[in-house]
Amino acid sequence: VIGGRAYSAISATDALLASAGASAHVNFAQTYSIPANTLNANSVLRISGSVLADQVDGTDTLEIKVYLGGTTLLTITAFDPSAVTDFATFNFEVVARAAAGATAACVGSGGWVTSDTGTEIRGAAVMATTNFATNGALVVKVSAKWSSTTALTNARLHTLNVDIV
């Protein structure tokens, strides 16, 4: 696992319907579980991916979050995908500052871009020193929340990549 790409998924089917993901975040099916004791001092975890609007209808907004374990790494500000070519991309880098353990200190930063009919909005996130239980498995996951339950609206976790170096 250490030394490069640990996980890569490209999915044509990992969709989240607005009718199922309104008012609360719902996890996409694609996840990656980092094995216990993988993140040690000076290990770098890189997470990247994209969410694509598969079907759009009306003015429903979409908010996306990326997690490591139970910690939110970044939140993509809600945007209104108005065409099936609209998307969001994200990347986040976590650096372990301590040996694997129950409270291994990590720091991180990353960014995101949304594209809504060609209009791009960018954002950034910084994670202050945060302790993770790296002596156990840590799950990388992505969730989304729609603003309403419009039946013909959905988004798909198009790609999810995890690198550990």
Which residues does each predicted region cover?
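Surface-exposed molecular-recognition determinants
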Residues: I2-V165
